[in-house]
């Protein structure tokens, strides 16, 4: 028989840097999970992606055990990294902060594709190009 799920927690945690301080500690403490056990498991599983912000879905079971799934970094983080900018534009329709080539966009698409709601790379490129436009990053050829 499958374990009974009591809570699902969604957090964004830096890879390899989970610690008991907020937001991880309070969220897991309320669910009754051993915080240090989660931190050790998470850090071990994500040490190769150190520094990336990872959306994480933590499933807490009735016996206070847990499992977690990490996803790819948010599209905005990947786009900023590909464009080489620290942040998006405050006025994206007036002030552009960077230009991104279609080849660079396709690299981001290949990274992010498993987490998007499409399996078609061309449609995924359109999704991420729209997100880039909203951040003030111009995409060549789109």
From Swiss-Prot:
Gene Ontology biological process: translation
HAMAP family cross-referenced by the UniProt entry: Ribosomal_uL11
Keyword list, A-Z: Methylation, Ribonucleoprotein, Ribosomal protein, RNA-binding, rRNA-binding
Record protein name field: Large ribosomal subunit protein uL11
Subunit relationships: Part of the ribosomal stalk of the 50S ribosomal subunit. Interacts with L10 and the large rRNA to form the base of the stalk. L10 forms an elongated spine to which L12 dimers bind in a sequential fashion forming a multimeric L10(L12)X complex.
PANTHER family reported for this sequence: 60S RIBOSOMAL PROTEIN L12 (PTHR11661), LARGE RIBOSOMAL SUBUNIT PROTEIN UL11M (PTHR11661:SF1)
Organism name: Akkermansia muciniphila (strain ATCC BAA-835 / DSM 22959 / JCM 33894 / BCRC 81048 / CCUG 64013 / CIP 107961 / Muc)
Stated family: Belongs to the universal ribosomal protein uL11 family.
UniProt PTM comment: One or more lysine residues are methylated.
Pfam families: Ribosomal_L11, Ribosomal_L11_N
Job of this protein: Forms part of the ribosomal stalk which helps the ribosome interact with GTP-bound translation factors.
GO CC annotations, alphabetized: cytosolic large ribosomal subunit
Origin superkingdom: Bacteria
